Curated annotation (Swiss-Prot):
Keywords, comma-separated and alphabetical: Ribonucleoprotein, Ribosomal protein, RNA-binding, rRNA-binding
Native source organism of the sequence: Corynebacterium efficiens (strain DSM 44549 / YS-314 / AJ 12310 / JCM 11189 / NBRC 100395)
InterPro entries: Ribosomal_uS15, Ribosomal_uS15_bac-type, uS15_NS1_RNA-bd_sf
Subunit-structure text: Part of the 30S ribosomal subunit. Forms a bridge to the 50S subunit in the 70S ribosome, contacting the 23S rRNA.
Superkingdom assignment: Bacteria
Entry-linked Pfam families: Ribosomal_S15 (PF00312)
Protein name: Small ribosomal subunit protein uS15
Amino acid sequence: MALTSEQKKSILAEYGLHETDTGSPEAQIAMLTNRINTLTEHLKFHKHDHHSRRGLLLLVGRRRGLLKYLADNNVDRYRDLIARLGLRR
């Protein structure tokens, strides 16, 4: 399910570089993480929903690429972000 505008605003306020920041890797990764968590909860109840499972795998791959980009370009921002999001790496 897509994020509501209120959810996006709260995520961007917490993780973005400024209040209208949607392009920074931190903001994109935070929004993808929220969508991944939502889809994961959905799949716990709907185990046979393979279309959503494929969408989840695509989102995880997109987030992995953004995390790799951030780790290659700025390790300090990368470490700070994974600590704030609670991701394991």
